[in-house]
Amino acid sequence: QNNFLNEERFVKSFVRGRFNQKKWGRNKIKMALKQRQIPEQLIRIGFVEIDEDEYLKVLKELFVKKQEELKSETNSFKKKLKLRNYLLQKGFENELIFDLMR
């Protein structure tokens, strides 16, 4: 029981920190926690720490920032590919990225 509570506290703190400081998406956070052998149910509990509106706001901010960096890229296909890959690498879900890029 006590160990579970300590792990839960760790997971919540980890999720908050990685999202707020490093701007990681759920997929990247989940992979990092799985590498630490954290159970799936604890990971789901940890994701409660991420506000959905804030999550989408961060995704849009990263999208706009990367778009600015890629201004000089003339090939629109390459630009979209680089944008998508960047956001996937940050751990955001493919569906959300796809919706944002439409």
List where the protein language model places each region.
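An alpha-helical, amphipathic repeat domain used for nucleic-acid recognition
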Residues: 1-102
